C-alpha cells in the first residue's frame, strides 16, 4: 500500500470527493439506446438523448432501483419523494445544453462509508467518511481533442454522444478525508461496494468511475475552512493520492509565501505530476437549476424499499469484520479476499466444502493469486474448483499428502486435474515399519556423513532426511522421517 507524503504539521487538509458511478443498465436513463461501451462513435444515440424537439424522457426503472440500493448500502436515508432538475450549461459534449440531474431533493442523503487502512504492523485502522448525498443524473458525451489532451492547444475536437444519457449516480462525501491515502482508499471502497451490489462495474479505464476532489488546507486547530480547489482528470487510484498530495504541498507553499488561494478547478497532469489551472470554479447559481418539467416527481414506496433492502448482499466491510472475528483471519488476508466479490465467493464455497479457513486463505492469497497475476486470469477461469481446493487441503491436514506435494501438483490442478488423479499412488508413507528400513539403508550407505554428524556437524541431519525423501519419491511423511532419522543418528 502506498504511504502518504508527510504534510507539514501546522496545516491540515480538508478533502471531499465527488464520485460519478455509471450504472450497469442495458439502456440509457431516459431512452432505449444501448449503454454498451466501445461502440462506434455516435451510434448509441436517439432523439431523446440528443434533445431533439418533440420527444419526452421516460425514467428507466432499473436506474431508480440501482440508485436506491447504492444509497442503502451507503447507510443513507432514502427520500420517499424526490425529483429531477435541469442543470443549465453550454459545452460541446452536452447536446441539449442542459443536463437532467437532481438538485435540492436527491434520492438519498446523510449516509456514511467505512474505510480501512493497515498500519505498519498490519493492524486495521477504520474510519467512517460521511456521505452528504447521492443523486441520479445523465452523463454527457465525450470530447476527443487532436494534438492535446484538452481544448486548449488542440487543433480540432471531435465529439462522441454515445455516452450522453448514460445513467450515473453522483456520490458526494462530507469533507471528512484528511490525506491522499484516505481519499484513494475511500474511492476504492466505494468501487468495491458498487461491484458487490452489481450496480456498476467501476472500470476507471472505461469511465465508469470518475472522481473529482475538493481540497483546502487550514492551520491545525482553525475551524474555518480554507478556500476550496477542485481537481479533475485523475484516472487511477494512485493518481488520486498523488494529485492530493501535490495540491496540499502547493497550497501550503502558496499560503506561506503570502499568495491568495483562489476557488478554481485544476487538472491533474500525470506526465508532469502536478495540477494546472483550468477555470474559475462555478457555483450552483451559475447553473440556474429548475425542476425538470418533462418528468414527474419520483416516489419510492415502502414495498419497493423493503424489497430492494432484502436483496442487498453482504458488503465488503461486513465480510472483513466477519472473516476477522469469526474465522480468525488476518486483516491483510481479509482485504485480499474481499477485494473482488468473486474471490470472496470462491473462498466461501471452499470453506463450505470443508476447507480450513486459514489454509484456504493462504492458498488463495498466495499460490493461486500468484498464478492468476502471472496468467492475467480471473479466479473463475481456473480449473481448480473450490471443492477440489478443499479436497487438497483436507488431504494435507489428514497426512495423506504433504504440502510440498500439493504445491508441486498445483499447476496441473489449476488446469483442471482432479485431486484423485493428481495424487493417485502419491499418498504419504506414514507407517514406521515401512520407513524405518529405508532410513537404515540411507544411513548405512553414507558412513562418512554419519561420522561428520556424530563429530558435531548436526546440519547433516537434513542430508539424511533428503535422501529418504528422494528414495521414496517424496512420499515419506516429513514429520515421521525427521523423527526416525534423528533417533537413528543419535542412537
Swiss-Prot record:
Protein's GO biological process:
glutaminyl-tRNAGln biosynthesis via transamidation; translation
Q: Which InterPro entries match?
A: Asn/Gln-tRNA_amidoTrfase_suB/E, Asn/Gln-tRNA_Trfase_suB/E_cat, Asn/Gln_amidotransferase, Asn/Gln_tRNA_amidoTrase-B-like, GatB, GatB_C_1, GatB_Yqey_C_2, Gln-tRNA_amidoTrfase_suB_CS
The record ties this protein, via SMART domains, to: GatB_Yqey (SM00845)
Q: Which domain of life is it from?
A: Bacteria
Query: A Pfam family matched by this chain, by name?
Result: GatB_Yqey
State the EC number(s): 6.3.5.-
A GO term, aspect molecular function:
asparaginyl-tRNA synthase (glutamine-hydrolyzing) activity
Reaction equations catalysed: L-glutamyl-tRNA(Gln) + L-glutamine + ATP + H2O = L-glutaminyl-tRNA(Gln) + L-glutamate + ADP + phosphate + H(+); L-aspartyl-tRNA(Asn) + L-glutamine + ATP + H2O = L-asparaginyl-tRNA(Asn) + L-glutamate + ADP + phosphate + 2 H(+)
Q: Which SUPFAM superfamilies match?
A: GatB/YqeY motif (SSF89095), Glutamine synthetase/guanido kinase (SSF55931)
Q: Which UniProt keywords apply?
A: ATP-binding, Ligase, Nucleotide-binding, Protein biosynthesis
Which EC class is this protein assigned?
ligase
Assembly state and interactors? Heterotrimer of A, B and C subunits.
Q: What does this protein do?
A: Allows the formation of correctly charged Asn-tRNA(Asn) or Gln-tRNA(Gln) through the transamidation of misacylated Asp-tRNA(Asn) or Glu-tRNA(Gln) in organisms which lack either or both of asparaginyl-tRNA or glutaminyl-tRNA synthetases. The reaction takes place in the presence of glutamine and ATP through an activated phospho-Asp-tRNA(Asn) or phospho-Glu-tRNA(Gln).
Q: What is this protein called?
A: Aspartyl/glutamyl-tRNA(Asn/Gln) amidotransferase subunit B
Specify the species: Nostoc sp. (strain PCC 7120 / SAG 25.82 / UTEX 2576)
Amino acid at each position: 500500500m502506498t504511504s502518504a507524503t508527510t504534510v507539514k504539521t501546522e496545516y491540515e487538509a480538508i478533502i471531499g470527493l465527488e464520485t460519478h458511478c455509471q450504472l450497469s443498465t442495458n439502456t440509457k436513463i431516459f431512452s432505449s439506446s444501448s449503454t454498451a461501451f466501445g461502440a462506434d462513435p455516435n451510434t448509441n444515440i436517439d432523439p431523446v438523448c440528443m434533445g431533439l424537439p418533440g420527444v419526452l424522457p421516460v425514467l428507466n426503472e432499473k436506474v431508480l432501483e440501482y440508485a436506491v440500493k447504492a444509497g442503502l448500502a451507503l447507510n443513507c436515508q432514502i427520500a420517499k419523494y424526490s425529483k429531477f432538475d435541469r442543470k443549465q450549461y453550454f459545452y460541446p459534449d452536452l447536446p441539449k445544453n442542459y443536463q437532467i440531474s437532481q438538485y435540492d431533493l436527491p434520492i438519498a442523503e446523510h449516509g456514511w462509508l467505512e474505510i480501512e487502512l493497515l498500519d505498519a504492523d498490519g493492524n486495521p485502522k477504520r474510519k467512517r467518511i460521511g456521505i452528504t448525498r447521492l443523486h441520479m443524473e445523465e452523463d454527457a458525451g465525450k470530447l476527443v481533442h487532436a494534438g492535446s489532451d484538452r481544448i486548449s492547444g488542440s487543433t480540432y475536437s471531435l465529439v462522441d454522444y454515445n455516452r450522453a444519457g448514460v445513467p450515473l449516480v453522483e456520490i458526494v462525501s462530507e469533507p471528512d478525508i484528511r490525506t491522499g491515502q484516505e481519499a484513494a482508499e475511500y474511492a476504492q471502497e466505494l468501487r468495491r461496494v458498487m461491484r458487490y451490489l452489481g450496480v456498476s462495474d467501476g472500470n476507471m479505464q472505461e469511465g465508469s468511475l470518475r472522481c473529482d476532489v475538493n481540497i483546502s488546507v487550514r492551520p491545525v486547530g482553525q475551524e474555518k475552512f480554507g478556500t476550496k480547489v477542485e481537481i479533475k482528470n485523475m484516472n487511477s487510484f494512485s493518481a488520486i493520492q498523488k494529485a492530493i498530495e501535490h495540491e496540499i504541498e502547493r497550497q501550503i507553499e502558496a499560503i506561506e509565501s503570502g499568495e491568495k488561494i483562489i476557488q478554481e478547478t485544476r487538472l491533474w497532469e500525470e506526465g508532469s505530476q502536478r495540477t494546472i489551472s483550468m477555470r474559475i470554479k462555478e457555483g450552483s447559481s451559475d447553473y440556474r437549476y429548475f425542476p425538470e418539467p418533462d418528468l414527474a416527481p419520483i416516489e419510492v414506496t415502502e414495498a419497493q424499499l423493503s424489497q430492494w433492502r432484502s436483496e442487498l448482499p453482504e458488503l465488503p466491510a461486513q465480510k472483513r469484520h466477519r472473516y476477522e472475528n469469526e474465522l480468525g483471519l488476518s486483516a491483510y488476508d481479509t482485504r485480499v479476499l474481499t477485494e473482488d466479490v468473486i474471490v470472496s465467493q470462491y473462498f466461501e464455497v471452499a470453506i463450505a466444502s470443508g476447507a480450513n479457513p486459514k489454509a484456504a486463505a493462504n492458498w488463495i492469497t498466495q499460490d493461486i493469486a500468484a498464478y492468476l497475476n502471472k496468467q492475467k486470469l480471473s479466479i473463475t477461469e481456473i480449473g481448480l474448483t473450490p471443492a477440489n481446493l478443499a479436497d487438497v487441503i483436507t488431504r494435507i491436514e489428514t497426512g495423506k499428502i504433504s504440502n510440498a506435494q500439493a504445491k508441486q501438483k498445483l499447476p496441473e490442478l489449476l488446469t483442471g486435474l482432479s485431486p484423485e488423479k493428481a495424487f493417485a499412488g502419491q499418498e504419504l508413507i506414514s507407517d514406521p515399519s515401512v520407513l524405518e528400513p529405508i532410513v537404515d539403508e540411507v544411513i548405512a550407505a553414507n558412513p562418512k556423513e554419519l561420522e561428520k554428524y556424530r563429530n558435531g556437524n548436526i546440519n547433516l541431519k537434513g542430508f539424511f532426511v533428503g535422501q529418504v525423501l528422494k528414495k521414496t519419491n517424496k512420499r515419506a511423511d516429513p514429520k515421521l522421517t525427521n523423527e526416525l532419522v534423528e533417533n537413528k543418528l543419535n542412537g
